[in-house]
Regions:
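C-terminal catalytic domains of large/alpha subunits in multi-subunit enzymes
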Residues: 1-176
């Protein structure tokens, strides 16, 4: 007698009595990791009385190969730029004598919101990368790191002082 079991029965049996379902994962690893490129330009306004920095506009152009999902690529770029703006202007972690972070909630750890930044414009220079999946390159790191030099240079251009530690706070600007 021949016995057979359907794939559906196997899937159901694999989950019965288990909290974790059966899972299959596939990844792509290129032999080379071609770098993405990005250029960023920031326009800032520095209040000479309060030393507050207002980011009026941030423009960027990103070459991340061929975007596999253009909408998600744009959101990734805009979100990373916002993280880079926060790293540059507001985000700071300090520690108490025991080594515990003093900024233990979003009330103390200041991340920028949409009202804290002006216009953010991102364009893409599409290219085909033969070593990437479907012609794509990475995008995550380049969009976070580019706002720092652009904003820092804009502040230096406005007040004539270059800063070498982050974040560039109004207190640091006032003491410059």
């Amino acid at each position: 007698p021949s016995k057979s079991v359907s794939l559906g029965d196997i899937a159901t049996a694999s989950m019965f009595g288990h909290d974790i379902p059966l899972e299959v994962t596939e990844t792509h690893m290129s032999p080379l990791s071609p770098p993405p490129y990005m250029v960023g330009a920031a326009e800032v306004e520095v209040d000479t009385e309060t030393s507050e920095v207002k980011l009026l506009e941030f423009d960027a152009c990103v070459d991340c190969g061929t975007p596999i999902n253009p909408n998600l690529t744009r959101v990734q770029a805009e979100g990373g730029i916002l993280q880079g703006i926060g790293m540059t202007l507001t985000e700071n972690v300090t520690y108490d004598q025991r080594g515990w972070p003093m900024e233990n909630s979003l009330m103390q750890y200041k991340i920028p919101t949409r009202v804290d930044v002006g216009r953010v414009r991102v364009e893409f220079e599409n290219s085909y990368e033969p070593n990437g999946p479907f012609g794509a390159k990475s995008i995550g790191e380049v969009v976070i790191n580019t706002p720092l030099p652009a904003i820092s240079d804009a502040i230096c251009n406005a007040i004539g002082t270059r800063f070498y530690e982050l974040p560039i706070t109004p207190e640091k600007i006032a003491m410059a």
